A protein has these predicted regions:
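Hydrophobic structural segments
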Residues: 2-299
């Protein structure tokens, strides 16, 4: 997939309109020149390099929307740059959005196949009219040690002291509790009802593997731990594997939360990490929120 080409085409298409906005508060609210989005990104790359993360090629990371030369009056970090997040960022006077996930829904943001879609057009137009830029940091953010996405989840779960950062698979060693109690703890700490459990609710749990998405990531956690905690995984693979394992007498479980609930908190960390890098610019974390709801059963 020609992701690099599509992004260049997009920036070129948006550049004409956004170039006219170069005067957009360049003096800023403080009567001084503000850095551009591209300049902020260079500061981020330098900070990452100091931490041992050298910027390299990525199919994901880079500018996805808007003009990199846009003067920045405020920065918002977020899990995913949804239309709602863009509107809230604008209302908060944050015209540079740093997102962990994609802007145009597919992981690779193939803009060229979406340019005629009305939702895509509306999103592009909104950014152009409001002089906003969106930059994605996915791969390089995960490369920090410890991975701030999973460390952020551990903090939110109040399990940081139980979290093993240096071993693989990543896992928690918790005081023993049942699988049902694990799920209820996760619901409570993340503030969401969107928790799916596969396995015996009474299963005794001491170790929980922390993993992402696909079965090949879940398997090491299941083999090494009592339970795998995963954010968004294909049901036809992970759940059915576990059902077969349970049919063979293996005492294992899976707790699934949404992709957002797994990774949101690492972008809250990103906002705090950014503040000393650009002390002259306001930085704020804007939570994306759960994409779906689970209505209660009535009857």
């Amino acid at each position: 997939m020609q992701t690099g080409v599509s992004r260049r085409r997009f920036v070129q298409s948006a550049g004409t309109a956004l170039a006219a906005a170069a005067s957009f508060s360049r003096a800023g609210a403080w009567g001084r020149s503000n850095p551009t989005a591209a300049e902020v990104v260079e500061l981020i790359k330098k900070k990452l390099a100091v931490e041992g993360v050298i910027w390299g090629p990525s199919a994901f990371d880079g500018f996805h929307l808007g003009d990199p030369n846009t003067p920045v009056i405020g920065v918002a970090t977020t899990f995913e740059s949804t239309f709602d997040v863009l509107k809230r960022a604008l209302a908060a006077k944050k015209n540079f959005v740093i997102t962990h996930e994609s802007t145009f829904w597919d992981g690779f943001d193939p803009v060229e196949v979406m340019l005629h879609d009305p939702v895509c057009q509306a999103k592009i137009r909104f950014a152009e009219e409001n002089h906003m830029a969106v930059w994605r940091i996915h791969d390089h953010w995960h490369r920090r040690k410890p991975d701030p996405i999973f460390a952020g989840l551990a903090r939110k779960l109040e399990w940081t002291s139980y979290y093993s950062l240096d071993t693989r698979p990543r896992h928690y060693e918790i005081p023993e509790m049942s699988l049902e109690e694990v799920a209820r703890h996760i619901q409570s700490k993340l503030g969401t009802r969107n928790v799916v459990v596969v396995g015996d609710p009474g299963l005794r749990v001491k170790t929980i593997g922390d993993c992402a998405h696909i079965l090949s990531s879940v398997l090491p956690a299941l083999r090494a731990c009592d339970v795998a905690l995963v954010g968004e995984t294909p049901e036809y693979a992970t759940f059915e594997y576990l059902r077969d394992a349970m049919a063979l007498g293996m005492k294992k479980g899976v707790v699934m939360i949404s992709h957002e609930a797994l990774e949101e908190w690492g972008m809250e960390t990103c906002a705090e990490w950014l503040k000393p890098i650009v002390p002259e610019i306001p930085v704020e974390w804007i939570p994306t929120g759960d994409p779906f709801q689970v209505p209660p059963i009535r009857g």
